[in-house]
Amino acid sequence: MSEKKIPYKIYLEENEMPTQWYNVRADMKNKPAPLLNPATLKPMTAEELGHVFCDELVKQELDDTNPYIDIPQEIRDFYRMYRPSPLVRAYCLEKKLGTPAKIYYKFEGNNTSGSHKLNSAIAQAYYAKKQGLKGVTTETGAGQWGTALSMACAYFDLDCKVYMVKVSYEQKPFRREVMRTYGASVTPSPSETTEVGRKILAEHPGTTGSLGCAISEAVEAATTREGYRYVLGSVLNQVLLHQSVIGLETKAALEKYDITPDIIIGCAGGGSNLGGLISPFMGEKLCGEKDYQFIAVEPASCPSLTRGRYAYDFCDTGRVCPLAKMYTLGSGFIPSANHAGGLRYHGMSSTLSQLYDDGLMEARSVEQTSVFEAAEQFARIEGILPAPESSHAIRVAIDEALKCKETGEEKTIVFGLTGTGYFDMVAYEKFNNGEMTDYIPTDEELAVGFAGLPKVE
């Protein structure tokens, strides 16, 4: 098909939207290792997980055999409010870079939450409501997940308690107020409201928090209240399952114009966006149908894939959550206060960790000043102000496009633009004022985190 016929934005029709989520674990030869009970170090049973998570979500978490799972009609109806999202051809960026590469990005910022997080938030809220629960608790880093969940809970009339990483709580007051507007209560983490929060504050006075800290508090808040369950915005298998709508739509849009990507790039914190984007393409690679280059991009200040260890570790700082086998910096690792709050997590999805360990994708770490250079370049050329998290993928997409400029290769690059950065102006202000710095943890600092890894036979 002629390139001239490829529009700036490729939209699917509503009747072309996915009716099933794709479960990449079903096609994996080496399955992700099971979650372990922190007390017994034995695989978690559905009954044990049911004390923390909603029943139907537990089934999804443990399902590594069914490749497709039906999306309930109520969730599909909600998706129609903001999906399908566009796959955008970055013609202006290509021209500015002078590259023969073809660049596409899947834009997930066209909803009030400002990011892809709503795809899983509405699913988890639906199952909580269906179970007859009063409410849910959660953590949030930059605030996108908390915003998405507050929207979903408002839709299903559920109570929503959010523990927000303290550095983001302070940097992003407007994100906090959006959550409150949708009815959520928002607490900076670590806090004095939970036992684990008080313990972390005593051990790390003045800490700016981390996703691991906030998870611990949210889990405690859920398990000590009748009629509540904990929900998570990343890392877990169930979240990657719900986020597969991103990759399924991307794949369908590309196929409409007979486009085959060479490189697929996503930012990586806990893995929700990356897993959602690459899963359907990874399935083809696993089945030997096609080959793609997958690149996970993480902050150099929190490099779980590029410098972490593949081991069982606690998913939270307070060590109350199940243990997951993943690439980790240690649950006690507290990353520097970088401006990509959604990527400040010590570990990585077990599913993505297994795929990475099997050599099926690669990872790169980038420093935040170079990330914001790419973010501003993208904003000025493509007209979208990207979230700091998304900008990690932009950085590497530009790098790959410039490589094509040097070699003359006409590669097709697809990356995930997870959301907008309109609530991240403190970060942009720091960059514009020349006050932004890069921080890369030393080997000695990482060793402290590794020393705390649990001993699992």
Model regions and ranges:
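Positively charged, low-complexity intrinsically disordered leader regions
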Residues: E3-L133
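Active-site/ligand-binding loops adjacent to catalytic centers
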Residues: Y68-D70, I200-Q238, I246, D258, ...
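Active-site nucleophile and cofactor-binding loops and adjacent substrate-binding regions
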Residues: F107-L118, V136-W145, L236-V239, I265-G270, ...
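A short, small-residue-rich loop immediately preceding and capping a beta-strand
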Residues: S120, A128-V167, T260-L274, F294-I295, ...
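Alpha-helix C-terminal capping segments
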Residues: A123-L133, T147-D159, R180-T181, I278-G288, ...
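Active-site-proximal loop->helix
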Residues: T137, W145-T208, S304-F314, M425-N433
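Claisen-condensing/thiolase-fold acyl-transfer catalytic domains that form or cleave C-C bonds
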Residues: A268-G276, Q368-G434
